[in-house]
């Protein structure tokens, strides 16, 4: 049996379902795959398959996530759904499953709940660019005015966290009714059932409102330096994996981080001992750099397109602190705690200056298992940018995972 080839004919977009526990995220995920399977462009996945999500490890943290894929007439989607609330927090912060957009599921019967707010805040902090809302459990609400009220509440909540609350599409329906209809008749066609039609309407809103992500290869060039060699007669070679963009022989690049930024020319690109004209996102390459001595460059610096990234020492981060069971600390930590921040390829010591709760109030003590916003001051400047992931380590073990939510200086 030959392996199925991945046909890349449609643009690919990564999305996920977010929202409060028991509002129907997993049921909706099942409803989407079943509805699109009936329309001929997905493999139907039952609720049970999705809910029994396998464990994965991302940056040393165990997360349960279910991955399903499906297609609309215009796009191919990879969809992530997490069974537990803690899994969502960990997934969004570590970027284990990157989301180009998300479907926020809100129960029409209950309205926005604490985790609805928390997931919207997280989406904002970790840089999920666009949301579409599904008001679920519509079959449990008889009063049209109540639906309108919940919709208004959701829009206000979105606006509060700087999403365009007035413009985000809100589709109402019932994931469970759609699933039940499809169990009775797996071949429902568009126009035959109001509940499955609402799921199709939701997917059309996702198609139209969640923009296609910019491909890694189209972004400005960046490679984090992993190792440095000196080749006699040729000069200095820095090796690493190209994170984004592409680099050609003869191009000017900048070396950023730890010391003053320097500019030089790439005189060679090598991969597996072969010379290339250019290296691109995903390649592990060695770059030969003109006029750079071995001691001028070290692991932890980045090589990038001039002007595309700058070194910083102070930032705000949204952090998940590992529990004792996850291999994290057993005890709390306080202000002026000085762990290492593992950024791309290196550990940099930093001091945590303060902690802030979701409501903006100051927090004195951080416990294992907490999610917290912190302000960090690094001892040396490092190339960092908003949305970048990092780990917090202490004596070589990971005690937290975070994402840069704001650069301060």
Swiss-Prot record:
InterPro entries: EF-Tu_GTP-bd, EF-Tu_GTPase, EFTu-like_2, EFTU_2, G_TR_CS, P-loop_NTPase, Small_GTP-bd, T_Tr_GTP-bd_dom. Belongs to the TRAFAC class translation factor GTPase superfamily. Classic translation factor GTPase family. EF-Tu/EF-1A subfamily. It catalyses: GTP + H2O = GDP + phosphate + H(+). HAMAP family: EF_Tu_B. It is an enzyme of class 3 (hydrolase). Residues 136-139 are annotated as: G4. Mg(2+) binds at residue 26. It is found in: Cytoplasm. Gene3D superfamilies: P-loop containing nucleotide triphosphate hydrolases, Translation factors. GO terms for molecular function: GTP binding; GTPase activity; translation elongation factor activity. GO terms for cellular component: cytosol. Keywords: Cytoplasm, Elongation factor, GTP-binding, Hydrolase, Magnesium, Metal-binding, Nucleotide-binding, Protein biosynthesis. This is Elongation factor Tu. GTP binds at residues 19-26, 81-85, 136-139. Monomer. SUPFAM superfamilies: EF-Tu/eEF-1alpha/eIF2-gamma C-terminal domain (SSF50465), P-loop containing nucleoside triphosphate hydrolases (SSF52540), Translation proteins (SSF50447). Its main location: cytoplasm.
């Amino acid at each position: 049996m030959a392996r199925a080839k991945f046909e890349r004919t449609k643009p690919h977009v990564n999305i996920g379902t977010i929202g409060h526990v028991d509002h129907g995220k997993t049921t909706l995920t099942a409803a989407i795959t079943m509805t699109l399977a009936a329309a001929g462009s997905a493999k139907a996945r039952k609720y049970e398959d999705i809910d029994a999500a396998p464990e994965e490890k991302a940056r040393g943290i165990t997360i349960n996530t279910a991955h399903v894929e499906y297609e609309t007439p215009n796009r191919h989607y990879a969809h992530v759904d997490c069974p537990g609330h803690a899994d969502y927090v960990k997934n969004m912060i570590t970027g284990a499953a990157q989301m180009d957009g998300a479907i926020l599921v809100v129960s029409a019967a209950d309205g926005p709940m604490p985790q609805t707010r928390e997931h919207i805040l997280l989406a904002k902090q970790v840089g999920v660019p666009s949301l579409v809302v599904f008001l679920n459990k519509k079959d449990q609400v008889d009063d049209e005015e109540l639906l309108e009220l919940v919709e208004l509440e959701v829009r206000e909540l979105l606006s509060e966290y700087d999403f365009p609350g007035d413009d985000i599409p809100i589709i109402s329906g019932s994931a469970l009714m759609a699933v039940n209809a499809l169990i009775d008749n797996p071949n429902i066609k568009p126009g035959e059932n109001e509940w499955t039609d609402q799921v199709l309407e939701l997917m059309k809103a996702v198609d139209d409102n969640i923009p296609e992500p910019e491909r890694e290869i189209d972004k400005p060039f960046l490679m984090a330096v992993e190792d440095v060699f000196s080749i006699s007669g040729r000069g200095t070679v820095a090796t690493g994996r190209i994170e984004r963009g592409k680099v050609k022989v003869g191009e000017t690049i900048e070396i950023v981080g730890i010391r003053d930024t320097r500019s030089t020319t790439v005189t060679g690109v090598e991969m597996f001992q072969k010379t290339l004209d250019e290296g691109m996102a995903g390649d592990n390459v060695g770059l030969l750099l003109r006029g750079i001595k071995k001691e001028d460059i070290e692991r932890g610096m980045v090589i990038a397109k001039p002007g595309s990234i700058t070194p910083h020492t102070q930032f705000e981060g949204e952090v998940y602190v590992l529990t004792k069971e996850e291999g994290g600390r057993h005890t709390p930590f306080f202000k002026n705690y000085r762990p290492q921040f593992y950024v791309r390829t290196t550990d940099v010591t930093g001091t945590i200056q303060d902690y802030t709760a979701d409501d903006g109030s100051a927090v004195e003590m951080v416990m294992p298992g907490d999610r917290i916003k912190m302000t960090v001051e690094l001892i040396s400047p490092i190339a960092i940018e908003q949305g970048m992931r990092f780990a917090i380590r202490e004596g070589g073990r990971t005690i937290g995972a975070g994402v840069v939510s704001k650069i301060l200086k």
